[in-house]
Amino acid sequence: MYSYWQSEEITKDPDLLFYLKKHYLSIDYHFRRTDGTNVKEKAKILVYYCYATPLYFFQNLIFKCQTFDNFINLFIPNLTALTEIAIDCGMYCILDALEGRSSKIEENGVTLNKGFSLTIDFASSYVKCFATKVDISLLMQYITTQLQQGDIVVSLLLNKLISKVANV
């Protein structure tokens, strides 16, 4: 269902395309204007835009969190008014961001890629914030599949989830 929302078939209607562009530009505008002093107000505004375009909102939010590491702890706790479908879209975008990573380890073979580690931090903070509402079965299935394929880097995601959500 979510991949249909990302398809170009939905943008054939000119009115819908106009409002999608308007929402996209507004989301970008409010993300650019967010700083440490107005996070609550901007989060509230962005949640309203998330009702209309949740996939674009979460893709943009994950990109911002991969770029600015302090954005995760500032922004995630303020997303309290999300609907269940928006929370589900957030999990879909997290899985998409984790799968879309071509390199998880730096070229030296030892260090984690900064974007991948920040995606892991975002995922664990997101699951902790919405622990009672989020369905993590697909995330656990992703971790299981990656571990069966021999990708042990994903065990760090499992470690972060256990340590943040379960407080172990």
Model-derived segments and their meaning:
Residues M1-V168:
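Eukaryotic alpha-helical solenoid repeat scaffolds
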